[in-house]
Amino acid sequence: MSRNSYIQQNSDIQAAGGLVPMVIEQSARGERAYDIYSRLLKERVIFMVGPVEDYMANLIAAQLLFLEAENPDKDIHLYINSPGGSVTAGMSIYDTMQFIKPDVSTICIGQACSMGAFLLAGGAEGKRHCLPNSRMMIHQPLGGFQGQASDIDIHAKEILHIRHRLNSLLAHHTGQSLETIERDTERDNFMSAERAAEYGLIDSVINKRQMPA
């Protein structure tokens, strides 16, 4: 855990310009300091913040696998605030979410765009949420390639294959038809919290945390 915490801390320090709060806990062995993300990891909370890229994806996947090993029957909570990013990096997170035994509850805070929206929709059924002022956006995958005509054709076919795969999975998770998804992702399609719930991207909009009775 300490090694994972160190890696996570360094990543988030870079992303936040060096400002990561530390939490001091008292125990029988004395005081112990955690960065805030490592402390939340103990509560089975993972933060996915910023562009989706390979390094982030490896960290998220590692944390999902670690929490599964800790308790395979307890939910994991993935908080998303991301503009999107790499399709392959995002798919590695998605596949890990589907692979592990615990349900992964997804919660959008701020924004979940492109691959961020896809991962939001990929959470466990009935456990996909967002806060009331969050924004979601879906669109088709973007790609650009320069080179010989034959290579451009190869990459164009790959992008079309990826688009069909993403649209099919999004249709599965939202309950929309494939034709509807294909139409709605032709251009950037922004959604409010309420619209995302109607569309099936999430299951509910959360205004207040429900406290146990």
From Swiss-Prot:
Gene from which this protein is expressed: clpP
Biological process terms in GO annotation: protein quality control for misfolded or incompletely synthesized proteins
Function per UniProt: Cleaves peptides in various proteins in a process that requires ATP hydrolysis. Has a chymotrypsin-like activity. Plays a major role in the degradation of misfolded proteins.
Quaternary structure and partners: Fourteen ClpP subunits assemble into 2 heptameric rings which stack back to back to give a disk-like structure with a central cavity, resembling the structure of eukaryotic proteasomes.
EC number: 3.4.21.92
Family recorded in the similarity comment: Belongs to the peptidase S14 family.
Reactions the enzyme catalyzes: Hydrolysis of proteins to small peptides in the presence of ATP and magnesium. alpha-casein is the usual test substrate. In the absence of ATP, only oligopeptides shorter than five residues are hydrolyzed (such as succinyl-Leu-Tyr-|-NHMec, and Leu-Tyr-Leu-|-Tyr-Trp, in which cleavage of the -Tyr-|-Leu- and -Tyr-|-Trp bonds also occurs)
Record-given protein name: ATP-dependent Clp protease proteolytic subunit
NCBIfam families: clpP, PRK00277.1, PRK12553.1
One GO term describing the cellular component: cytoplasm
Any GO MF annotation of the entry: serine-type endopeptidase activity
HAMAP family according to UniProt: ClpP (MF_00444)
Active-site feature positions: S114 (nucleophile), H139
Taxonomic source organism: Pseudomonas syringae pv. tomato (strain ATCC BAA-871 / DC3000)
